Amino acid sequence: MGSSVKKVKWWIYLIFIGSFALAELVVLLFSPQYQTLVWFCFYTSISNFCIPWLPHEPMVLLYGTLFNPLLVAFLGGIATCWVEFLNYKILGLITNIRQIQTITKKQWYLKAEGWFKKAPFLSLVISGLTPIPFAPFRVFSVTSRYSLTRYILSVFVARTPRYYILALTGAVIKLPWWGYGILFLIFLAIALYSRLHIRYAKG
């Protein structure tokens, strides 16, 4: 089972990279002035996918100064929905592994999942819109077999307004270029510290 999961994961990674390569080619041929937005979508996706500790907030703030905040928010929402579709599929495979099922069948997990199932859509929207960690709710969605369509819809409903607020804030405050670099480093340091703190706490 483990080897088959790895093979599927690599196929998903290839689909992920290929989709953005195709988008880059299409935009380059027909609307080259929006080429950097493809990279924005790519960055937004990997910060919710294979490199989750990458901060997306400074990038959304920056792009709010370069393009219409509504456009930035909409594309950010679409990119996040695309990557969450892939996340859902990967987690569906991982949670079928026997070692993982020993965790998801524990009493504490089933109790937490039960609370999630009382209001899954609202839970996903609130965690996606606010600083509340989204990852546990993503896992609950998969293990509780929550509708993929509703899951993706909740992601769009939650993330798009969040991106719009950030992009609009960026358009209003208009920091110097180095300001976004400092913000990026601050958010990155916080994310890495949190991950290390959790790892040491578990150890």
Each language-model region and where it sits:
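Residue-level signature of transmembrane alpha-helical cores of multipass secondary-active transporters
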Residues: 44, 123-127, 155
